[in-house]
């Protein structure tokens, strides 16, 4: 099984820890997302999803672990094509909520904005391996 190699960018958040960023393609546009091994599932910014999928959204109020156990309005949507490196994930079922404050924080520290968090659902499904020395994410597509 051949590995899909995705470059990572390591950023320092004011000596308070490091985050990994990666490029993703959503709605045929390149964006940056945070690679978060502690996130149970991948999420995308609500405004991005609303901009492209307004007519097909499902809205719900639920307790969401991704927002530190607070009640928030989440949006469920299907992204027609999510690309991570050469990996193409079609009809990706996602949850979206407001990531603007997260993106704003990155920008305040001189980093680019982010539109999503790539979490455990994708990382487990594609047997992800993070190589910190080479700053690469390897994903393995199941046959």
Give residue ranges: language-model regions.
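Pepsin/retropepsin-fold aspartyl endopeptidases
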Residues: 1-143
